[in-house]
Amino acid sequence: MDAPRIDAPRPNDLELGPNKYGDSESASSWFNPGALLSTSWDASSNIRRYIAERLSASCYIPSNPLFQQGSIMKKSLRERKSCKQRLPSAIVAGVKKCGGQQIYQFLRLHPQVAGTEKDLNFFDNVGYNDTSPEAYRLQMPYSTTKQITMDADQSLFQRPYNAPQLVRKFLSPNVKIIFVLCDPVERLLADYFSQWMKENSGLMNRDERVTFAMRFQASALDKTQTFRMDERNEFLDLSVYVQHLIRWLQQFTTDSILAVDGDLFKLNPASEMKKIEDFLGLRNFFRKGHFFNNDNTGQTCINFPQQFCPPRAKQHPELEDWATNKLCEFFKPYNDGLLDILNQRMSWMNNC
């Protein structure tokens, strides 16, 4: 029996471009409003079915590029689809420089995910202005009961210090929390270098590389001899994952927290995305063939439902072996503690 017809606005013509998973014609040339109520799950391999699934599950009409939220459906249709602005039931809470933002952008392509288009950093402002749960909810996208609402905040893992209590209070003890953890030495260096580049714009010549190395040694390497956390710098502190995870486990059970291996994501993104889908209770959408590695930038990219590569990160200078060894020696007991708590060996734990 044919699905009942719904009077819905037509999507904008999407010039989807040629793709091995579907045709290159525009969405409106085949759009059938009846698809809003009846779709089969081949949305991960066929661009037509993907658009139909987005239309069925979402409160927005897909636009080009598909990473954008799209245009909101008219009010009458939103009411019939029970569209509401809901508080997040899941959040990607870091860690900075470990790929969490990229993973979140990929997740937003899933038809069953309604996610904010940018980090709101809402919990940084609790206590200032209007930071009530209602104010937070009104910053969320509309979603249907077929979707989960998500937010991302790459600094939340570390700060504010009472972030676990705030998330539990504003959302729920059952909210799903995703942390992306990567090699702490590499994370530390990438974070420090990013800040250095903000203060010293432009390409680095030989003298500048020497200056960077000296500043890094003074700021980070020398601080590894300090055992008081409040005397270490922020870059070093954030890479001591276990101390922050303990605060989160005081408020949430292990069933509510997923630690994603950021280094493994670069090697096998489909596998890590499936772990996230299973954790969130989503249908499996992402496939191995969706991802590829950009040889020019080294970045993990996606080619379905539309090709997207994140901006290239600036490459930091390599550390000398003695410096790497010193940092490895510093982080090893903390990594061992993380292994004990998570009961999960990260691929990067073998780097030192």
How does the language model describe each region?
Residues 1-5, 10-158, 170-171, 175, ...:
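PAPS-dependent sulfotransferase catalytic core
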Residues 80-85, 221-231, 311-322:
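Short glycine/proline-rich turn/loop motifs
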Residues 87-88, 131, 135, 162, ...:
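Short, conserved clusters of charged catalytic residues that mark active-site
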Residues 99-100, 136, 150, 167, ...:
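Generic structural signal for small/hydrophobic residues in well-ordered secondary structure
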Residues 99-112, 163-172, 191-194, 234-285, ...:
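PAPS/PAP-binding and catalytic site of the sulfotransferase fold
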Residues 121-123, 153-158, 234-235, 262-266, ...:
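Short histidine/acidic/glycine/proline-rich micro-motifs that form metal-
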Residues 130-141, 201-275, 283-287, 329:
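PAPS-dependent sulfotransferase catalytic domain
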Residues 246-336, 343, 348-352:
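The conserved 3'-phosphoadenosine-5'-phosphosulfate
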